[in-house]
């Protein structure tokens, strides 16, 4: 893996529209973590200008997915390139430096990778991270935001319970 992000990314929306929709689905779950983890991780920091710009950009990751994500999923499942799908692809493809995207949601994913169920059921990274966001928002006492995200997760089938990722509290 490269230590720096690429200078350019070329995205063919036709290819994504014809790929298995579960990859877009998991990508949306992972992308929303950019906003929530950046916000919480940088709360008491004075970030450098490039990090500050990344944090500001991360605020644009959750709202569009909550607004257009359900329609984009339907369009991807129908293999149709639409404005909603194109918008979501754009947001999922953005990035923020690793310093602010390694919060609780991603830490939970890392922990879940040792469970046999993660491998056995082929849970995708963003699928597990999306559940971790709910836990992170609960731990941070952001209940209204958690409930908003919970409703969205339910609307497109992203995990809302440990059982959805085949895990148990005793694991």
Descriptions of predicted regions:
Residues 1-54:
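A glycine/threonine-rich phosphate-anchoring loop and its flanking beta-alpha core
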Residues 1-8, 99-105, 171:
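Short intrinsically disordered, low-complexity coil segments enriched in acidic
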Residues 17-18, 95, 165, 169:
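A broad, structure-centric signal for solvent-exposed, well-ordered loop/edge residues
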Residues 41, 74, 121, 161-162:
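Secondary-structure boundary/capping residues
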Residues 46-152:
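Active-site segments that bind and position negatively charged phosphate/pyrophosphate groups
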Residues 142-171:
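C-terminal charged capping/lid subdomain of soluble metabolic enzymes
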